[in-house]
């Protein structure tokens, strides 16, 4: 099977949401409807500030995505800001406890991420952020993750980025970032914030900020 890489398109959103739900959905905690709406909210949240994005496909089927934001560059899709606001309003207007719980968890997670950014001063030390990195389990072994990473690092170098950062957590495979030479700059551990952790327990446990240089190279394929 041949992997093809191309720029992300606005009409990729549904496929991205489907894979996001498959990977990180919380239907077990809030039900299928609220979980899918939350996945759409997260995808729009990450897409809204993005200035660069690459999609991987196999035989036309979505297999992965990496979104990045270079500070000061033009966003990919201006209309996503309104789409995000509408999605959050839709979830709020549902009037049921499951949608309210899902949205509150996302807002709480965002607040933790902002605290980590402030603690680490990461926005002052970097020129870009990786917004969303997702690879379908169906694509493992085909070089999708490595291909998305390589193309994004090339773009960051082209845009003059010396250092970038990303948010990640215990629901993700952080060994990929260790392999590619990133360092952990900040940690929010559930055990140290038991009271607040209950707010985000359905989404994450521990959260991290990692940062790296787009010049660090790894030749071995990592899927």
Each model region followed by its residue ranges:
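Conserved GNAT acetyl-CoA-binding A-motif
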Residues: 127-128, 156-169
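Conserved active-site alpha-helix within GNAT-family acetyltransferase domains
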Residues: 116, 146, 158, 170-193
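Conserved acetyl-CoA-binding loop-helix of GNAT-fold acetyltransferases
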Residues: 135, 141-154, 179
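Conserved acyl-donor/pantetheine-binding loop and adjacent beta-alpha core of acyl/acetyltransferases
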Residues: 72-128, 191-202
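Active-site rim helix/loop that mediates acceptor-substrate recognition in acyltransferases
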Residues: 31-53, 57-59, 63, 67, ...
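Conserved GNAT-fold acetyl-CoA-binding loop/helix
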Residues: 21-42, 81-88, 102
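Conserved beta-strand-loop-alpha-helix junction that forms the acyl-donor binding cleft
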Residues: 131-133, 137-140, 165-175, 189-195
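A short beta-loop-alpha structural element at the N-terminal edge
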Residues: 4-18, 70
């Amino acid at each position: 099977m041949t992997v093809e890489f191309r720029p992300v398109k606005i009409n990729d959103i549904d496929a991205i949401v489907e894979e996001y739900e498959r990977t990180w959905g919380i239907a077990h905690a809030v039900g299928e409807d609220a979980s899918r709406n939350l996945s759409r909210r997260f995808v729009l949240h990450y897409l809204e500030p993005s200035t660069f994005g690459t999609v991987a496909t196999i035989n036309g089927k979505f297999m992965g995505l990496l979104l990045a934001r270079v500070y000061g560059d033009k966003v990919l899709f201006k209309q996503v800001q309104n789409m995000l606001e509408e999605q959050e309003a839709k979830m709020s207007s549902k009037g049921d406890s499951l949608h309210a719980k899902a949205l509150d968890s996302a807002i709480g997670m965002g607040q933790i991420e902002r605290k980590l950014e402030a603690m680490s001063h990461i926005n002052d030390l970097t020129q870009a952020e990786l917004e969303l990195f997702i690879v379908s389990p169906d694509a493992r072994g085909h070089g999708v993750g490595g291909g998305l990473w390589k193309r994004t690092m090339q773009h960051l170098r082209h845009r003059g980025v010396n250092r970038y950062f990303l948010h990640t957590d215990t629901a993700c495979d952080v060994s990929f970032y260790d392999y590619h030479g990133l360092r952990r700059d900040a940690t929010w551990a559930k055990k140290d914030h038991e009271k607040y952790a209950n707010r985000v327990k359905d989404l994450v446990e521990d959260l991290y900020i990692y940062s790296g240089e787009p010049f660090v190279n790894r030749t071995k394929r990592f899927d």
